[in-house]
Swiss-Prot record:
Assembly and oligomerization: Homodimer.
Residue intervals passing through the bilayer: none
One function term, GO molecular function aspect: O-phospho-L-serine:2-oxoglutarate aminotransferase activity
Database matches in Gene3D superfamilies: Aspartate Aminotransferase, domain 1, Type I PLP-dependent aspartate aminotransferase-like (Major domain)
Catalysed reactions, semicolon-separated: O-phospho-L-serine + 2-oxoglutarate = 3-phosphooxypyruvate + L-glutamate; 4-(phosphooxy)-L-threonine + 2-oxoglutarate = (R)-3-hydroxy-2-oxo-4-phosphooxybutanoate + L-glutamate
Protein name, UniProt field: Phosphoserine aminotransferase
Enzyme Commission number(s) from the entry: 2.6.1.52
Pathway where this protein functions: Amino-acid biosynthesis; L-serine biosynthesis; L-serine from 3-phospho-D-glycerate: step 2/3; Cofactor biosynthesis; pyridoxine 5'-phosphate biosynthesis; pyridoxine 5'-phosphate from D-erythrose 4-phosphate: step 3/5
Cofactors required: pyridoxal 5'-phosphate
GO BP field: L-serine biosynthetic process; pyridoxine biosynthetic process
Provenance organism: Shewanella amazonensis (strain ATCC BAA-1098 / SB2B)
Major subcellular site: cytoplasm
Amino acid sequence: MSAVYNFCAGPAMLPAAVMKKAQAELLDWNGQGVSVMEVSHRGAPFIQLAKDSEADLRELMNIPDNYHVLFMHGGGRGQFSAVVNNFLGDNGKALYLVSGQWSKAATEEAKKLAGDNSIDVINVVEKVNGLNKVVIPALSGNGSEYRYLHYCPNETVDGIEIFDDIDSPWPIVADMSSNIMSREIDVSRFALIYAGAQKNIGPSGLSIVIVRKDMLELPQLTQSSIMDYRLTAENDSMYNTPPTFAWYLAAEVFKWLKSVGGIKGMAEVNAEKARRLYACIDSLDFYKNGVAPQNRSQMNVTFQLADESLDKDFLKEAEALGLVALKGHRIVGGMRASIYNAMPLEGVDALVSFMRSFAAKHSS
């Protein structure tokens, strides 16, 4: 079978080495004689897996000791609710920066739970010379106006990424579902980081929460046990049955990432993948990207064909070559190539080669 490169935005492709290992030990994990899907989450073998995976993630991201690492249910949308419910009791307020579809969705969920008067919003994307550019105003305050500031560093739908650190007098909460572990960050700048697993961590069904311990002292809005950070931390993410198979695969992804140079090494590869793809887009009038260069996502490269009538042909011919899931999100249309950690350089090179040949064939 010829190679297939999966550019899906999520659930996304997993590293081939991880998939092969999971296949090899699917029926007999860790010498147990049964699948990891069949063992008790409270048994010693899985407890060890949980401890090892947390240790690996802490090492990869250099997570300080004053942070909890939680393995939870619910994905990113689940965390939209969890953040509000855990931090906005006693009439607390929060500030949300909107840079695209996912930060907008988080804002809408926050308003639904806490009420419009508890959520202030700043739209931070402006059209500059016809391109979407992130412009974050100076944020000033004494630190007591808001319980937290929420933003999404990478917008998968819009192809927008915020690379610069945000200077905020309030604790920063970040939805890193689509760019976690793609480049180095200083975790200590954040009060909470959350990420749905299905892009750079593992399969869907799992979410990672990295939360500074002092944040758990804030009054809760509601006490929903399943998404209670305090309860989850007190029970080592085992208050209820976790998504064990997704956790196992995440643990294997962490090991794989360590073996290929860690986040520093992966960041170099990711930057090169994005550079090659954007260089192709910019060098041909046949394609266009609507994001300012400094905010172009390294994970989700969006582009449109100059002649939209060729969209279906582009997708059909790409798929025939094993380049799949390139259709853009229904809200924005066009194309989207998601090139998360697991996408090899060879996949990007194959896409670039096809894009150049397709453009040559259809250019007048």
